[in-house]
């Protein structure tokens, strides 16, 4: 059996991006039985024709106890590397005879395999990004703040026909470039500063 909880992985498998926050959302795969089921808060209705059977849980429920009823009492179970400890620890209480393993490598490996269409999208996004970098470099010495430079990049992406950012860009000058996850601010660059442009498009 395998529990998948990462919203990006569930989106990959179901084609629907949902962010449950602190609430339970898991896909349970029972490979031996050939069954898959979604266990999710009732705040996220799946419509009349969900891909797989759905069990809804309420905030007042012991949602992991409900989940545990779908899981064997013995054997090996793969757990999503991103599953919150509060859920995992409760499941370990309810199913102490299971052997728990990191099961994320299964979905991670599957997601690495790209269709021809997906490969074409990635190649095109890379091409557009290369063009955007060429144009953005010419804007670096014009006195824009880091935030303004990011705004300029979005204009460039749209002008090139891109949908926009694949992630919010990091545009930083000088000392800010030493922070690998810097949040763009109102800093401006000066002659001799290092510049980092960590960007990507869709």
Residue ranges and their predicted role:
Residues 1-69:
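N-terminal accessory/capping or targeting/presequence segment of soluble
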Residues 4-5, 30, 80, 172, ...:
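Short beta-strand segments
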Residues 10-20, 104-107, 144-202:
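Short catalytic-site patches enriched in acidic/histidine residues
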Residues 24, 33-35, 72-76, 97, ...:
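A general structural motif
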Residues 38, 54, 100, 170-171:
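Generic preference for hydrophobic
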Residues 45-48, 87, 188:
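A short local loop/turn or secondary-structure capping micro-motif enriched for an aromatic residue
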Residues 62-165:
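Flexible, acidic/His-enriched mid-domain "rim/lid" segments that flank
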